[in-house]
Every structure is written in C-alpha cells, then in structure tokens.
C-alpha cells in the first residue's frame, strides 16, 4: 500500500470557502478514498487516468466554486466575444491593430476553455478522475495556447512600434497580407513549440498514486509520477517551456523602449498623451500576463509550492482573459463606441 507523504497533504485551499478544519478533513478522506482506488489489485491493471485534486473542500464549497467559475467563464466568453463581433461589424475597426485584437480575443476564449470546463466538471465529480488522453490533450492545448499568446503579444507590440516609430511607412508595411501572415505564424509556432516534448512525456510510464495536486495536467507533478526518470526529457521541457516566454518578453521590452524614445521626442504634450494612450491597453495586458508568469518561473521555491503554482496559474489562465476585454474597452475610445453600438446602448 502506497501512503501519501506530507507534501501530498499540503493542500491549497481557496480563501473564505475552504479555510476551516472540516475542509482539511474532507480533503484527507477524499485522498484516502482515491488511494484505495489506485492501489487496489483489481484496479491496478485496468485504470487509465489521473486524479486532479483541484481545490479540495466540502461539497458545499465545491458547489460555490462551481458557481463562481461558471460566472467567470461566461463573462470571459461574453467580453471577448463582444470584441470579436465589434471588430467584425464595425468598418472603422478593420485596421491591423484591431484585427490582431480580435484574434487575440479569440485566443483568450480558447485559452480559458482549455481549463475551466474541466475544472467545472471536477467540482461536481466525486472521483475527480481525468483519463490519460484527456490529461495530455489538456496539457498540449494549455501550453500551446499559452505560447501562442506570447507570440501574439509580441506581434501586437511590433504593430505599435511601427505605428508610432514609423507612422508614414506604417500603411505600406503593415498590410492586410502581412497582418494575416503574422496571425497564422503565431498560431502555427505556438502549436508546434511543445509538440515533441509533450509527445515524449506521454510515452513515459506512470506509477504510484497518480494523484496530481493541481486543477489541470501540469508537467511538474506529472513528471514526479513517472516510474523511471527521464533527465533528457525533463531538461528539454524545462528549457523549451520558459524560452518563448523570455525571448518574446525581451522583444516586447525592446519594442517599447524604442516607442518610449520616439514618444519623448514629440514636441507637444497632447501628442505624447495620444501616443502613450495607443499603447496603454497593450502594456497593461502584457504586465498582467508576464507579471504572473515571471512570478511562476522567477520566484524561489516556497513551502507551499503546489498552492503557489495553482494560484499563479489560475490568475494568468482564468483571471487575465476575464480582465483583458475590460482593459481594452476602457482605454480605447473607438472600441468603446463599437461595443456600445454592438450592445445597442
């Protein structure tokens, strides 16, 4: 019989919903029941999946979390969907900046859909089991969409650089054809970046408890469940995972450094404010996304590492897609007008 270590019982609890003694007891009984399932002889050869612990708490807490994340998911779909429709129907927004924004909003819908529906099913499930194929499909789409988001943020920064630093040549450089090619390349590069390492990890053998202390299939807990360590695969993934994040972040920083230098040369204060206002929304979105990612990769390990990983992942995969439409609509007058027209207000 395989027993849980102290780290396995280090459960991250949602504030105000699961912060009492009964939550811990319920979580312990849940883990104990799952351990029986996985380690019983009758199930060792037939079971093909993992257990996602998610946010362990009593049944009432699970229902409240289900309602909360359902509302967040629907608001995210509505906000990003509104931007897509506004750009599609308003002729004034048929410019590269807004075409990129509409594609980015579609990406955000895909990104949040890769995690939240499975979370909602997990809240209502007694077993909290996810199949091997379901786990690795979520693994692939979550990381591929995250990489695609990094590429899109870099392309949008490049667009702002051209608009401010090369205003006279902008219409001839950022053509509809170039914009389309950039969008396609973002999707293609994002989806091929992690393909080989994820396929290699999926071919490894897993044994032990098969309990993942997360709300999604994350590589860190997955690799700890392998029967035989694969240092080469772990090294490749640990290098490939942060590489697009930091490379594209440096590209964005460099682009905005040139933008700031160009804006500071504008003689009038009104001109400087207008130039900065065109970049403000994108800078806010970049700060939200990369701020949470840098906390994930840059902060030292903590005692409750699993809890930190859940919190940070929840922020940039669920909260950020919810806030992005609000940021773009508040900071952009043309987008506000288009959204008001779309909603008939």
Curated annotation (Swiss-Prot):
Gene3D superfamilies: Rhodopsin 7-helix transmembrane proteins (1.20.1070.10). Disulfide bonds join 135-217. It is a multi-pass membrane protein. It is found in: Cell membrane. It comes from the Eukaryota. InterPro entries: GPCR_Rhodpsn (IPR000276), GPCR_Rhodpsn_7TM (IPR017452), Olfact_rcpt (IPR000725), Olfactory_GPCR1 (IPR050939). SUPFAM superfamilies: Family A G protein-coupled receptor-like. Residues 1-62, 114-135, 203-241, 297-309 are extracellular. Glycans are attached at residue 43. The chain crosses the membrane at residues 63-83, 93-113, 136-156, 182-202, 242-264, 276-296, 310-330. Keywords: Cell membrane, Disulfide bond, G-protein coupled receptor, Glycoprotein, Membrane, Olfaction, Receptor, Sensory transduction, Transducer, Transmembrane, Transmembrane helix. Residues 84-92, 157-181, 265-275, 331-345 are cytoplasmic. The keyword Transmembrane applies. One of its GO terms (molecular function) is olfactory receptor activity. PROSITE patterns: G_PROTEIN_RECEP_F1_1, G_PROTEIN_RECEP_F1_2. Its main location: membrane. One of its GO terms (cellular component) is plasma membrane. Belongs to the G-protein coupled receptor 1 family. Odorant receptor. This is Olfactory receptor 11G2. It comes from Homo sapiens. The gene is OR11G2.
């Amino acid at each position: 019989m395989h027993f849980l270590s102290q780290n396995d019982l280090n459960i991250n609890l949602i504030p105000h919903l699961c912060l009492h003694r009964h939550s811990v007891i319920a979580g312990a009984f849940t883990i104990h029941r799952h351990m029986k399932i996985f380690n019983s002889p009758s199930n060792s050869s037939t079971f093909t999946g993992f257990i996602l612990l998610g946010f362990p708490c009593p049944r009432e807490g699970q229902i409240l979390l289900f309602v909360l994340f359902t509302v967040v998911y629907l608001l995210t779909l509505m906000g990003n969907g509104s931007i897509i429709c506004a750009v599609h129907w308003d002729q004034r927004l048929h410019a590269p900046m807004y075409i990129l924004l509409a594609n980015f909003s579609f990406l955000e819908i895909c990104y949040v859909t890769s995690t939240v529906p499975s979370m909602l099913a997990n809240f209502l499930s007694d077993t909290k089991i996810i199949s091997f194929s379901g786990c690795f499909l979520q693994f692939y789409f979550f990381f591929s969409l995250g990489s695609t988001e990094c590429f899109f943020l870099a392309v949008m920064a490049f667009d702002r650089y051209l608009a401010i630093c090369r205003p006279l040549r902008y219409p001839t450089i950022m053509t509809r054809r170039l914009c389309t090619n950039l969008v396609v390349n973002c999707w293609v590069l994002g989806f091929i970046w992690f393909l080989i390492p994820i396929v290699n990890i999926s071919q490894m053998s897993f044994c032990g408890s098969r309990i993942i202390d997360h709300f999604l299939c994350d590589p860190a807990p997955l690799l700890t469940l392998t029967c035989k360590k694969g240092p080469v695969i772990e090294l490749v993934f640990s290098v490939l995972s942060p590489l697009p994040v930091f490379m594209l972040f440096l590209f964005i920083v460099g682009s905005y450094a040139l933008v700031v230098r160009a804006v500071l040369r504008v003689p009038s204060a009104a001109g400087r404010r207008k130039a900065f206002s065109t970049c403000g929304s994108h800078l806010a979105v970049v700060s939200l996304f990369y701020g949470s990612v840098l906390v994930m990769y840059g902060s030292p390990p903590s005692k409750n590492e699993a809890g930190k990983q859940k919190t940070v992942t929840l922020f940039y995969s669920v909260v950020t897609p919810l806030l992005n439409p609000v940021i773009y609509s508040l900071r952009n007058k043309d987008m506000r007008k288009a959204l008001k027209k779309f909603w008939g207000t």
